[in-house]
Amino acid sequence: TPPAGPDVGPR
């Protein structure tokens, strides 16, 4: 399962 929330994707 991919991480949910605003901490997803490149920083």
Curated annotation (Swiss-Prot):
Keyword Transport present in the record's keywords: the answer is no
Q: Gene Ontology terms, cellular component aspect?
A: extracellular region
Record GO terms (molecular function): toxin activity
Q: Where in the body, by tissue, does this protein show up? A: Expressed by the venom gland.
Q: Keyword annotations for this protein?
A: Bradykinin receptor impairing toxin, G-protein coupled receptor impairing toxin, Secreted, Toxin, Vasoactive
Q: Where does it reside?
A: Secreted
Gene Ontology BP terms: blood vessel diameter maintenance; venom-mediated perturbation of signal transduction in another organism; venom-mediated vasodilation in another organism
The protein's predominant localisation is: secreted
Report the protein's function.
Answer: Bradykinin inhibitor peptide antagonizes the vasodilatory actions of bradykinin at the B2 bradykinin receptor (BDKRB2).
Q: Which family does it belong to?
A: Belongs to the bradykinin inhibitor peptide family.
Q: This chain belongs to which protein, by name?
A: Bradykinin inhibitor peptide
